[in-house]
């Protein structure tokens, strides 16, 4: 992991960021959907 990999760091960061945003989005959507259906 000395920066000599074939995958650029910005590609890894972008994919990781999108994955985190997607997980957070699904989590918050599920929380709000569950909260709305329980009321």
Swiss-Prot record:
Stored InterPro entries: PSII_PsbJ (IPR002682), PSII_PsbJ_sf (IPR037267)
Gene3D superfamilies recorded: 6.10.250.2070
Pfam families per record: PsbJ
CC annotations in GO: photosystem II reaction center; plasma membrane-derived thylakoid membrane
Record bears the keyword Iron-sulfur: no
KW Ion transport (keyword) present: no
Topology class, membrane: Single-pass membrane protein
Keywords: Membrane, Photosynthesis, Photosystem II, Reaction center, Thylakoid, Transmembrane, Transmembrane helix
Single GO biological process annotation from the record: photosynthesis
TM ranges: 7-27
Assembly and oligomerization: PSII is composed of 1 copy each of membrane proteins PsbA, PsbB, PsbC, PsbD, PsbE, PsbF, PsbH, PsbI, PsbJ, PsbK, PsbL, PsbM, PsbT, PsbX, PsbY, PsbZ, Psb30/Ycf12, peripheral proteins PsbO, CyanoQ (PsbQ), PsbU, PsbV and a large number of cofactors. It forms dimeric complexes.
PANTHER family, sorted: PHOTOSYSTEM II REACTION CENTER PROTEIN J
UniProt-listed HAMAP family: PSII_PsbJ
Function per UniProt: One of the components of the core complex of photosystem II (PSII). PSII is a light-driven water:plastoquinone oxidoreductase that uses light energy to abstract electrons from H(2)O, generating O(2) and a proton gradient subsequently used for ATP formation. It consists of a core antenna complex that captures photons, and an electron transfer chain that converts photonic excitation into a charge separation.
Record family assignment: Belongs to the PsbJ family.
Protein name: Photosystem II reaction center protein J
Gene source species: Nostoc punctiforme (strain ATCC 29133 / PCC 73102)
Taxonomic classification: Bacteria, Bacillati, Cyanobacteriota, Cyanophyceae, Nostocales
């Amino acid at each position: 992991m000395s920066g000599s990999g074939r995958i650029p760091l910005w590609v890894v960061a972008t994919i990781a960021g999108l994955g985190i945003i997607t997980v957070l989005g699904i989590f918050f959507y599920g929380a709000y959907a569950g909260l709305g259906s329980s009321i």
